Amino acid sequence: MLPTLSVFFMLTFVLLCFLGILANGFIVLMLSREWLLRGRLLPSDMILFSLGTSRFFQQCVGLVNSFYYFLHLVEYSGSLARQLISLHWDFLNSATFWFCTWLSVLFCIKIANFSHPAFLWLKWRFPALVPWFLLGSILVSVIVTLLFFWGNHTIYQAFLRRKFTGNTTFKEWNRRLEIDYFMPLKVVTMSIPCSLFLVSILLLISSLRRHSLRMQHNTHSLQDPNVQAHSRALKSLISFLVLYAVSFVSMIIDATVFISSDNVWYWPWQIILYFCMSVHPFILITNNLRFRGTFRQLLLLARGFWVA
């Protein structure tokens, strides 16, 4: 791979992050304005506000981390900066996965059509429990962050003292800790929200697909507005599922496959890691009437300034 291609991927990564920051910032500003005007937010808006906020700061931290690692490869593992950056990144990453999970659960409860008593009870109680679920997610993320911080602090102390177990170098010892501690910790802490997400999103897709087929059979027309609305909802949910799965798998692979910043695949891999949190906000904006209208006006305004 030529250096120019590496520069291309680096610029693509920066553009992707900035687009994600702008999209998430737009969602947060829209909901903040609504919160100030009405004095409260709907349960769905609470989750979107929390998700947008965590993704906004996560991409800012991730952008700093990627370039700091790229510019300070040698001393990165044992630097104090790694501890500070990782402290914020681990908290925001855990919170983001949990907020995505609650968003999928809320979609499932609001849209899916099941007659099971447990589902009906959850449909009735879940909106009132959303603030507690969000608070619980933050507390869980704090605990997860402390567990990751212990590992990062161990690496930092070992780097300062130059004392490693066995006849190994710091790089080998650091890599062993990544495999034996960080990777299992990531799998355990991320599997719970991912399992909830997968169950709720698959139930919702199944319910929507069954309902869409029933409407197509009754109307005998694919041009019916209700059929088209359900088809759009299905496409949106499937894209959400794919992006979430890519994000989960890439996080796990990132803990097992070490890609150094001097590797030709470093910047393409950063693009994959941040792809979901950059693209999904635009899906949320296009599928929300309030967001879509304001966003279109902003684009037209920006286009007018650009032409002028």
Swiss-Prot record:
Transmembrane segments: 8-28, 61-81, 89-109, 129-149, 187-207, 240-260, 265-285
Cellular location(s): Membrane
Membrane topology: Multi-pass membrane protein
GO molecular-function terms, A-Z: bitter taste receptor activity; G protein-coupled receptor activity
SUPFAM superfamilies attached to this UniProt entry: Family A G protein-coupled receptor-like
InterPro entries: TAS2R
Tissues where this protein is expressed: Expressed in subsets of taste receptor cells of the tongue and palate epithelium and exclusively in gustducin-positive cells.
Topological region Cytoplasmic: 29-60, 110-128, 208-239, 286-308
One Pfam family linked to the record: TAS2R
Organism domain of life: Eukaryota
Family matches, as CDD domains: 7tm_TAS2R41-like (cd15018)
Positions on the Extracellular side per record topology: 1-7, 82-88, 150-186, 261-264
Residue positions the entry lists as glycosylated: N152, N167
One of the GO BP terms on file: detection of chemical stimulus involved in sensory perception of bitter taste
Keywords linked to the UniProt accession: G-protein coupled receptor, Glycoprotein, Membrane, Receptor, Sensory transduction, Taste, Transducer, Transmembrane, Transmembrane helix
Assigned GO CC terms: membrane
Other remarks on this protein: Most taste cells may be activated by a limited number of bitter compounds; individual taste cells can discriminate among bitter stimuli.
Free-text function comment from the UniProt entry: Receptor that may play a role in the perception of bitterness and is gustducin-linked. May play a role in sensing the chemical composition of the gastrointestinal content. The activity of this receptor may stimulate alpha gustducin, mediate PLC-beta-2 activation and lead to the gating of TRPM5.
Family: Belongs to the G-protein coupled receptor T2R family.
PANTHER family: TASTE RECEPTOR TYPE 2, TASTE RECEPTOR TYPE 2 MEMBER 41
Name assigned to this protein: Taste receptor type 2 member 41
Encoding gene (name): Tas2r41
